Amino acid sequence: MTALQNDTFLRALRRQPTEYTPLWLMRQAGRYLPEYNATRARAGSFLGLAKNPAYATEVTLQPLDRYPLDAAILFSDILTVPDAMGLGLSFAQGEGPRFAHPLRTEADVQKLAVPDMASLQYVFDAVSEIRRALVQDGRQRVPLIGFSGSPWTLACYMVEGGGSDDFRTVKAMMYGRPDLMHRILEINAQAVTEYLNAQIEAGAQAVMIFDTWGGALADGMYQAFSLAYMRRVLAGLKREHDGQQVPAIVFTKGGGLWLEALADTGADAIGLDWTVNLAEARRRTGGRVALQGNIDPTVLFAPEAAIREQVRGVLDSYAAAGGSDGHVFNLGHGISQFTPPDNVSVLVDEVHRHSRKLRAGQK
């Protein structure tokens, strides 16, 4: 096992003391970076990028070479799992993901099966290659995060056949044929568990479950159709590898109503979107979990002084409820492709600067 130069992120997830608040950014390797766009052009397509371990490694490291971030996250897509199930994933320019074979009928659902993880070997190869590429002067620069979509979020795409404004197709199935919905979710939960465990075996040092569309569910439906299946995944995860604890983060966008329940899933940390007050979230979760988040990504379009002010507000809010440890700074959702890269430098600088001051007892 290669020692880490910077383990601040992992210590924060374990709610241990840190010298400053670590940060990484959702979609930190992405279209806002010109170097990413150059690599994607060489790859020829998004899937050409995501399915090539050398390209995936290259783009994973790009934001780390530009900014002093405290974690790397595997470059991939949440829809690799349903693609491996045979649903026929494609990305049309400017249109987002599409599945050629969405799950619409009972027969479609009956045919669904957990994919052979060998069909996702390109993901695990990328994890291993990124781990090797992170080593500098005999030590690994920062930890590597692996990830998956939640069973419910994957099901949304699998039934709708792509993105949706109202999720009426998947919700109609949920309300009208809950038996079919539960079968999809059971298969997805098993697949996600195996997928994340394979990432851990390949070298992921923390994992995150993205429940992007959990917040589209009504109270009661969320607990039955999203939370229950994330809990099942978490119960099946390898939580130790190479003698090291592997922390797990869960993030339900729009999930502020259910923080107490999320804190009881067995996750080490909860990701929060920008609608949640951090001090209040900390009180509600009772210090049982670390918290990750949660600045509004559009703050990055503001002038420098405003970015710094908003960063301080997030850090101060968390610290007001009992000190700064146990917090990973992040955006409340993925970074916009239109974000000026220089503004990200301002955000990263202010997070590190102000969080050090807070720990030193200064304002």
UniProtKB/Swiss-Prot annotation:
An annotated Gene Ontology molecular function: uroporphyrinogen decarboxylase activity
Keyword Magnesium: no
Top-rank taxon: Bacteria
Subcellular location: Cytoplasm
Transition state stabilizer (site feature) positions: D77
PROSITE patterns: UROD_1, UROD_2
Principal place of residence: cytoplasm
Keywords for this protein: Cytoplasm, Decarboxylase, Lyase, Porphyrin biosynthesis
Top-level EC class: lyase
Disulphide bridges, residue numbers: none
Subunit structure: Homodimer.
NCBIfam families: hemE
Family named by the database record: Belongs to the uroporphyrinogen decarboxylase family.
Protein name, per record: Uroporphyrinogen decarboxylase
